[in-house]
Every structure is written in C-alpha cells, then in structure tokens.
C-alpha cells in the first residue's frame, strides 16, 4: 500500500520501486513506528479528530500489531510495502478498516520517520551503554587478577619502561569511560521529539507537542519544524561516537594480537575466540581480535558517508536522507557486537607472567631509572641522559642488561655511581617509583581498580 498516488496517472516503474523502497532496512523501526502511532492517536483526540472510543480501538489494534511484530519481525519483509510507515498503516487498516485511514491526519512521514529513528537511537544507546560498562567491568576484573604481571610498556613499538598488565587494562577502561560519557551526552541531545512538525512547517492542528513528547518518553519537543525534519546531526553524533569507540577497540585488539604473537608470547587466548588453519595444523589464530580490528574500517566509512550525504542538502527534507539508516544500523550493530566480543576475549585470557617479566627486563627498560639516579646525585638531567646512553651502548656491546654491568663499568661513565645503584635498577623499583596519580606503582594501580569498581557498581 502506497501512502500517495492521487497526483499520479501512471504506476511507478518496478525498477524505480525497488530502488526507492526502504522496507528492507527500515523494517527495524517497526516497534518505534507503532509506539509513535499510539501517541499520535492520543494527540488526535485532544484536537477532536478522533473520539476517545476511536482512539481506544486504534490503540488496541496497534498493540496487537506490536506483539505480532515482536514475535516475528521478519514477517514484514514478505510485504511489498514502500516503507515501514506504509506497512504499519496497511496492517492497521486491515484490522480496523476505514478508521485506520484517519490516523495519519496532521502527520507527515517526515516527522514520523525522524521520530522513529530518534526512538530507535535512544533504545540502541541504552544497549551500547550496557555493553560498554560490561567491557569496562571485564577489564577491571582482568586488571585485578594481574596486578603483579610485570610487562614491557612500549613507545614506537620498542620496549620503553616496565608497566603491568593491570595498568594496560586500566588504560582501556579510561578510553571506554570516555566513550560512555560521549554516549550519555548524545542521549541528552537525542531526547527531544520531532513529532508534530509535519512535513516541514509544523502541523495545522493545535496539538500540545510537549505533552506528546512526554507520552513518547522524550524530555521535550523540538523548537523548529524545519530543523526537526531535515537534520540528522544526532545520526552523525552517534556515528562519530561509534567511530571513536571502534578506534579504541581496534587498538585494544591490535595490542592483544601482538601480545598473543609468537614474538611477544605474553598472553594466550582462549580456544573459544580463536580458530585454526585449513592447511597448517599448528595454527591458533586470533580471529575474534582481527575481526574487531577489521570492522573498525566499516564504521569509519559509515560516518564519512553520512557526512557526505548531508553536507549539500538544502532545507528541508530530501530523499537523500533515506540513506541515514543503513550505515547507522550497521555501524551501531558492529560496535555493539565488538564490545561483546572484546569482553568474551578477556574471559579466559591467560597472562604468561614469567615471559612478560623476562621481556620487561630486556630492552634496557630501566635506563630512565639510571638517569633519575644520576639526577638525584646532582647531575643535570640532559647530561645524565647522555651518560646513560653511553652506558647502554656498553651494555649492548657486552650483551648484558644494565644491572649486570660491574660497578667499575658504570663508573667509567660517571664517578657518582655507587653500589646503591643496583636496587633502583630492579623492575619492582621501577614500578614503585611511579607513585604519582595515574602511575604504574602497585598502590596507584590498586587505587585505580577500586575507583573503577566503585564507579561501575
């Protein structure tokens, strides 16, 4: 059933119909469309278009349809309706006859779809927030279990200074917490209802749009009808949030792919999130993580595509805006799936503490400690930096770590070095000295874990 046609003397070409129809993807808005229609029927009572009895009949039929949709949403795809609005209205007319044709009074598909999409976005943000917090909790739990797992920290993918696996986990907790705050912030701007704005100039019926917004669970109604039906910056905002969130998950995945590699060998992933090779029987591939990393690109693409779609559109509604849904649906689905998968990866991960500690002791990760030691002895830092660089060259030449050089070797570079240098070159000393807020000291890490647990409880 088409919602238009009186103006036309020829039927649409079937090829155009297939090109134009959106039911194959906007069927996902069925529940929101029905909920919005129930609220609209109540608004029509307040302006005398519907009687209370008519509204009750419509609401009952819409609620029956809602249950049918929840039981089998795929049934919608068997229809040749143009879009979800046409499908819902057609089904309603099947149930209540001519009365169903009164429901669209004063309403346009322009404000209808804007409302449906905002309702869907609000529901989906709630799901994303839950998944995000579940992953944060999984990271905090993994951190708590691995506070003593010393490993190398990297800059430029070269061993830099010792950290702990717990500190690494907590770094991603911070990123995810910012992702969470962005979603919460987006939810505030989503929480305004466009219903009642009509096609572009507002509805001709004196409907209380604030009351209507409240019936739909919105905090308020939008202030400008042109803007309400023609902008999709809330879509851009969620796509931006998804793009940033997926970058964080991609980096998380890349780190663990490296940690799991034969070259690093810091962790072993569970069999539940890995796969094998059809040719090489020894392989255990980190496919879950590689897919998280790979899926990041499609989310960035959805954001870029939507920005390009909107950038040249004149006010108000244009059919181009039908392109807002597929990329949004896919991007948020992908982000949600990846949040769940990242949590699953952490469930069963094994940290190889001896190998991590061995790697942390290599690569002269304690060189900065020697420089700080010299500074404490009165040597200017820039000079100390140069002295330690020379000492590292000597250690490399001898094939030894810094702490294995003799005192005589070290004193060749600075006479202020004494026997008390050796304790400060230990891994434990390196960690304990980083005791300022946010540092890697055991005390700071334990405090950060407790604070994160309290925030997430």
UniProtKB/Swiss-Prot annotation:
GO terms for cellular component: cytosol. Keywords: Amino-acid biosynthesis, Arginine biosynthesis, Cytoplasm, Lyase. SUPFAM superfamilies: L-aspartase-like. It is found in: Cytoplasm. Pathway: Amino-acid biosynthesis; L-arginine biosynthesis; L-arginine from L-ornithine and carbamoyl phosphate: step 3/3. The keyword Cytoplasm applies. Its main location: cytoplasm. It is an enzyme of class 4 (lyase). It comes from the Bacteria. It catalyses: 2-(N(omega)-L-arginino)succinate = fumarate + L-arginine. Pfam families: ASL_C2, Lyase_1. One of its GO terms (biological process) is arginine biosynthetic process via ornithine. The keyword Manganese does not apply. PROSITE patterns: FUMARATE_LYASES. Its EC number is 4.3.2.1. InterPro entries: Arg_succ_lyase_C (IPR029419), Argininosuccinate_lyase (IPR009049), Fumarase/histidase_N (IPR024083), Fumarate_lyase_CS (IPR020557), Fumarate_lyase_fam (IPR000362), Fumarate_lyase_N (IPR022761), L-Aspartase-like (IPR008948). One of its GO terms (molecular function) is argininosuccinate lyase activity. Belongs to the lyase 1 family. Argininosuccinate lyase subfamily. This is Argininosuccinate lyase. It comes from Klebsiella pneumoniae subsp. pneumoniae (strain ATCC 700721 / MGH 78578). The gene is argH.
């Amino acid at each position: 059933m088409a919602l238009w046609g009186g103006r036309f003397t020829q039927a649409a070409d079937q090829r155009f119909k297939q090109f134009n129809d959106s039911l194959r993807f906007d069927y996902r808005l069925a529940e929101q469309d029905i909920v919005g229609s129930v609220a609209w029927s109540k608004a029509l009572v307040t302006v005398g278009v519907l009687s209370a009895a008519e509204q009750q009949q419509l609401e009952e039929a819409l609620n029956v349809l809602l249950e049918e949709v929840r039981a089998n949403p795929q049934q919608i795809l068997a229809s040749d309706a143009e879009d979800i609005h046409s499908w819902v209205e057609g089904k309603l007319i099947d149930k209540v006859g001519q009365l169903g044709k009164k429901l669209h009074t004063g309403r346009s598909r322009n404000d209808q779809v804007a409302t449906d999409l905002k309702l869907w976005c609000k529901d989906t943000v709630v799901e994303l927030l839950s998944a995000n917090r579940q992953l944060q909790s999984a990271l905090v739990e993994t951190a708590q279990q691995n506070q003593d797992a010393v490993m190398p920290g990297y800059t430029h993918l070269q061993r830099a200074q010792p950290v702990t696996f717990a500190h690494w986990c907590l770094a991603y907790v911070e990123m995810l917490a910012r992702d969470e705050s962005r979603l919460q912030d987006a939810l505030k701007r989503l929480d305004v209802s466009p219903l009642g704005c009509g096609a572009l100039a507002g509805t001709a019926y004196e409907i209380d749009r604030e009351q209507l917004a409240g019936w739909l669970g919105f905090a308020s109604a939008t202030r400008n009808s042109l803007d309400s039906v023609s902008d999709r910056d809330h879509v851009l905002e969620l796509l931006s949030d998804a793009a940033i969130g997926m970058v964080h998950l991609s980096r998380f995945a890349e780190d663990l792919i490296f940690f799991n590699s034969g070259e690093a060998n810091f962790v072993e992933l569970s069999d539940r999130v890995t796969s094998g090779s059809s040719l090489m029987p020894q392989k255990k591939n980190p496919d879950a993580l590689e897919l998280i990393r790979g899926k990041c690109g499609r989310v960035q693409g959805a954001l870029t595509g939507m920005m390009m779609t909107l950038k040249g559109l004149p006010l108000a509604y244009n059919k181009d805006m039908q392109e807002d849904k597929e990329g949004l649906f896919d991007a948020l689905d992908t982000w949600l799936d990846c949040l769940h998968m990242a949590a699953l990866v952490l469930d069963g991960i094994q940290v190889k503490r001896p190998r991590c500690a061995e790697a942390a002791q290599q690569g002269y990760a304690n060189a900065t400690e020697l420089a700080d030691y010299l500074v404490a002895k009165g040597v200017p830092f820039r000079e100390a930096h140069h002295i330690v660089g020379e000492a590292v060259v000597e250690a490399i030449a001898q094939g030894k770590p810094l702490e294995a050089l003799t005192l005589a070797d070290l004193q060749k570079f600075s006479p202020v070095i004494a026997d008390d240098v050796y304790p400060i070159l230990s891994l434990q000393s390196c960690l304990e000295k980083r005791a300022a807020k946010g540092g890697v000291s055991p005390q700071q890490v334990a405090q950060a874990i407790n604070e994160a647990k309290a925030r997430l409880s």
